């Protein structure tokens, strides 16, 4: 379809908002595009709000625990919703758009309807697009957006706890990764302790991210240092690819993190 913008002024940028279904889950997309996953199946995101999806996830979690009796710690990576992250084929500019604090990927038709039923008003696309500023962590959220965050957080905790309880019932500990699909987990929210997680893991580029992990109460803290053992680093550097320098990358990240380590309560690195 065609959208016509009227009254446009020179040198101004305009956005057209729309709701789309993403068929290709973005972590799978990232690894295929940057790390050449080849014939590995393209994964699709699921909507955990539907009873059928929840039943499948509970069955899968139970079956996994049954088949892996020797595993003592289960890492959730992380819960159900990822931040906004899009990749493209251009080798000179892989990252199309990323917003680590964005709740845009939580906007399914069912969630929007349930929110309106609970709060008495509807979210609009502009509440998420925010005049093109979007909703990254350095932007103060609106009252409506904070209500949406609370709405999602309540659901993620209530259903997520069921999966964690399954892990605990098999005598295993449950850790959560404070990165991929972390949206709705909100480790600094008042509800986080209701999950029952035993530990929190975070991959870190710098001291700020190290403190972000260590500041969460009631869990074991674990840092995961960069670079990852992938050909391409998360910021596009060819760490383990031809022309890369993993020693230099590791040294740079270590320098950025080490001062913060002196003041943190950490158990694992």
Protein language model annotation of sequence segments:
Residues 89, 99, 243-250, 256-260:
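An N-terminal assembly and electron-transfer interface module characteristic of large anaerobic redox
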Residues 66, 192, 210-220, 261-262:
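Acidic (Asp/Glu)-rich catalytic clusters
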Residues 22-46, 216-247:
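Active-site clefts of carbohydrate-active enzymes
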Residues 77-78, 177-181, 202-206, 225-228:
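Structural motif
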Residues 195, 199-200:
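Short, low-complexity, polybasic intrinsically disordered segments
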Residues 72, 172, 248, 254, ...:
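ATP/nucleotide-binding catalytic cores
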Residues 268-269:
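Conserved small/polar residues in nucleotide/adenosyl-binding loops
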Residues 1-194, 212:
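Polysaccharide-binding and catalytic clefts of secreted carbohydrate-active enzymes
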């Amino acid at each position: 379809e065609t959208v016509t913008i009227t009254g446009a002024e020179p040198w101004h940028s305009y956005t057209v908002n729309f709701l789309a279904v993403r068929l290709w889950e973005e972590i799978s997309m990232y690894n295929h595009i940057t790390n050449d996953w080849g014939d590995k199946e393209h994964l699709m995101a699921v909507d955990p709000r539907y009873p059928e999806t929840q039943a499948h996830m509970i069955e899968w979690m139970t079956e996994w625990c049954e088949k892996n009796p020797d595993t003592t710690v289960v890492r959730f990576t992380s819960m159900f919703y990822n931040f906004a992250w899009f990749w493209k084929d251009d080798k000179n500019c892989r990252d199309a758009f990323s917003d680590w604090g964005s709740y845009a990927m939580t906007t399914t038709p069912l969630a929007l309807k349930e929110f309106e039923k609970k709060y008495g008003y509807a979210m609009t696309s502009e509440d998420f697009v925010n005049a093109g500023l979007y909703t990254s962590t350095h932007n103060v959220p609106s009252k409506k957006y904070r209500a949406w965050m609370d709405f999602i957080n309540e659901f993620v905790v209530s259903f997520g706890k069921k999966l964690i309880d399954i892990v605990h019932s098999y005598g295993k500990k449950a850790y959560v990764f404070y990165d991929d699909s972390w949206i709705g987990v909100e480790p600094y929210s008042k509800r986080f302790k209701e999950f029952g997680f035993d530990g929190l893991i975070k991959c870190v580029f710098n001291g700020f991210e190290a403190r972000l992990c260590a500041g969460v109460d009631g869990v074991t803290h674990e840092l995961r240092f960069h670079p990852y053992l992938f050909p391409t680093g998360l910021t596009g550097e060819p760490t383990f690819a031809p022309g890369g320098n993993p020693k230099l990358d590791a040294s740079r990240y270590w320098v950025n993190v080490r001062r913060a380590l002196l003041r943190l309560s950490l158990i694992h690195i």
